[in-house]
Design a protein with these regions (language model features):
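Vicinal oxygen chelate
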Residues: 1-13, 23-121, 131-144
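Short acidic-aromatic low-complexity motifs
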Residues: 16-20
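C-terminal catalytic core of tyrosine-transesterase DNA break-rejoin enzymes
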Residues: 124
């Protein structure tokens, strides 16, 4: 079995409100780079976003290709999943993301599992957790 070299075995495919707005946000907020983009009359109807040379998400706007899928935000619900992505500097990425319009859910903090971690929500209501490994995990109390 084969796959493209820059594509992981699993890639989330999101529905976004606006392909153009999502392309702009993910580049400004998270530093993602646009990969393959299908543009119909100036409207992105499919896009791949890359991080460190790998595709991390693909997306299409609501209504594209006859889809009835909607974003968490347009449905008025909290996204049931969080995307977890390692980065070089979680504090810098958090500042960049919130400066670009992401909503803070959890500011950066050292976590018991050994990462410095934060969580933000993008304009479409998807939640993103970013982490940087700590040199040493904090001391954790064992679960009884």
């Amino acid at each position: 079995m084969s796959r493209p070299s820059n594509t992981p075995w699993l890639t989330p495919y999101l529905t976004v409100a606006s392909g153009r707005a999502a392309l702009d946000f993910y580049q400004r907020a998270f530093g993602f780079k646009a990969g393959h983009v299908v543009d119909e009359n100036g409207v992105p109807t499919h896009a791949e976003m890359q991080y460190k040379g790998q595709i991390v998400i693909m997306f299409a706007p609501e209504g594209a290709w006859g889809s009835t899928a909607r974003t968490p935000r347009s449905m008025g619900v909290e996204a049931p999943q969080t995307f977890y992505l390692y980065c070089e500097d979680v504090d810098a990425l958090y500042a960049r993301a919130t400066g670009a319009g992401a909503t803070s859910i959890m500011p950066p903090a050292d976590q018991f599992w050994g990462d410095r971690y934060c969580m933000v929500e993008d304009p479409d209501g998807y939640r993103w957790g970013f982490a940087t490994p700590l040199a040493k995990a904090p001391d954790a109390k064992p679960t009884p």
